């Protein structure tokens, strides 16, 4: 990071005393902008200021209050909540800017440059590609082929473990937990009806499988957010993350076997097409080869469109409409990422980021404590917003500072951010995944949570591996990691 922005190397102690040498790119932009005007837009308080966190607290409070009143986490759209927080941030900044001799234009410029961070803009386009891929794959029949192939190959008494594994494969291929829940719940409900299994149990298994890919997939928005905010390569984060969740996968699979019962599933109605699997195979293979995610998803999208048109799933016109639908389904998330970037820039100027960083690290004396503080931060943000991507984007800059301060590998930091945010979404009764499963199955969200075994075990093993410092051997050379990720 130091080499990238041309800053002079600073010591750990000096890091928090030089706004130009630390933190995300928005701090550099703020300072450069102020320098051009002969002013330094610095918060002036090296320990930070709690006022800088008020916009975020207002957002969380509004979200929790609206959810508590209506019982629906979707009552207040995230973009509206963040917009309100941004308005308050500008109000709080106005007084400080006046005292510092800066104008409203300076705040707007800093906000725009915070939202225009190269990491966020790249993330913006990757999110749009992920939405296009999801809609194209669904429209040309790839989703149904993947699900049916898995069920057809499994013995009847392995249906429940198989449902979990199919959820893992499907979510890893699609990169979306919501898409996986939507695709598998109809199958899960049918299995429950035929075998007499508990509906909440089946819902919990589907959600568990969905959260596997949400956490690990190369095209998951959480993976994209975690790796881009920490400036590490996806394959490095995948290796570290997979080792940390592997015990949770194994134990969940074993629990499914014990809960499973013989089922007479009519497999003659399950059809699949080998050619339709190509987009999923392509995106997984290219990603594992280290091909940039934009190129990997682009190739898979083109393959899906070509196959869909050739098989009659799309016409040229409907293919374009499907691409448009994909953009629409992710444009909210993409826009929110940019809004959060601008909000965090203003919060940083107010001293909120430094205050939170100071409080989180005040009593931290080791890399282990730093990792636990990062895990706690992203989990709390996720439970409050029920959006693991936004929680990672918000916590990412702070986590990067903490990891640099205590020599924690950014690869490990990215893994912790993604693991704990996904685990939080997988057990939160008002999160979208559980709400979707409960709505389709007609059961209570709270009845599903105890059966979300994988997400619960993610918490258990995530904390356990932080405490024992495993997996070992991860590079702590964060500058080198950043250079690799930038290529």
Identify the role of each PLM range.
Residues 157-170, 196-213, 369-382, 406-427, ...:
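Alpha-helical transmembrane segments of multi-pass membrane proteins
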């Amino acid at each position: 990071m130091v080499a990238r922005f041309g800053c002079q190397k600073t010591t750990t102690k000096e890091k928090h005393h030089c706004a130009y040498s630390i933190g995300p790119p928005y701090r550099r932009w703020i300072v450069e902008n102020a320098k051009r005007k002969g002013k330094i837009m610095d918060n002036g308080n090296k320990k930070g200021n709690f006022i800088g966190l008020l916009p975020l607290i207002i957002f969380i409070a509004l979200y929790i209050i609206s959810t508590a009143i209506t019982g629906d986490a979707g009552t207040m759209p995230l973009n509206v909540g963040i917009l309100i927080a941004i308005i308050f941030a500008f109000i709080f900044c106005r007084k400080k800017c006046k005292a510092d001799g800066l104008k409203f234009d300076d705040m707007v410029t800093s906000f725009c440059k915070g939202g225009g961070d190269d990491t966020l803009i790249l993330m913006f386009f990757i999110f749009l590609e992920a939405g296009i891929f999801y809609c194209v794959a669904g429209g040309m029949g790839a989703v149904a082929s993947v699900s049916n192939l898995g069920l057809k190959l499994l013995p009847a008494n392995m249906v429940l473990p198989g449902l979990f594994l199919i959820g893992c494969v499907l979510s890893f291929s699609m990169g979306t937990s919501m898409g996986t829940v939507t695709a598998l719940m109809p199958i899960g409900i049918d299995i429950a009806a035929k075998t007499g299994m508990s509906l909440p149990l089946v819902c919990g298994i589907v959600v568990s499988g969905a959260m596997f890919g949400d956490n690990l997939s190369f095209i998951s928005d959480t993976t994209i957010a975690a790796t881009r905010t920490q400036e590490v390569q996806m394959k490095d984060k995948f290796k570290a993350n997979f080792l940390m969740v592997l015990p949770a996968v194994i134990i969940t699979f074993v629990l499914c076997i014990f809960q499973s019962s013989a089922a007479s599933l009519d497999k003659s109605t399950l059809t699949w097409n080998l050619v339709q699997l190509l987009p999923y195979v392509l995106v997984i293979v290219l990603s594992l080869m280290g091909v940039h995610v934009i190129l990997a998803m682009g190739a898979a999208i083109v393959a899906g469109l070509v196959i869909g048109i050739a098989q009659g799933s799309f016409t040229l016109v409907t293919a374009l409409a499907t691409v448009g639908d994909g953009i629409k389904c992710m444009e909210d998330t993409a826009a929110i990422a940019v809004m959060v970037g601008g909000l965090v820039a203003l919060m940083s100027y107010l001293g909120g980021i430094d205050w939170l960083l100071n409080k989180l690290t005040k009593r931290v004396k080791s890399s282990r404590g730093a990792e636990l503080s990062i895990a706690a931060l992203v989990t709390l943000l996720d439970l409050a917003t029920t959006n693991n991507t936004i929680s990672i984007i918000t916590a990412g800059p702070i986590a990067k500072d903490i990891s640099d301060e205590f020599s924690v590998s950014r690869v490990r930091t990215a893994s912790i951010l993604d693991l704990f945010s996904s685990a939080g979404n997988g057990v939160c009764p008002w999160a979208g995944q559980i709400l979707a499963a409960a709505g389709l199955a007609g059961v209570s969200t709270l009845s599903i949570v105890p059966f979300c075994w994988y997400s619960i075990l993610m918490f258990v093993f995530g904390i356990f591996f932080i405490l024992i410092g495993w997996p070992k051997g991860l590079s702590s050379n964060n500058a080198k990691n950043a250079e690799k990720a930038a290529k």
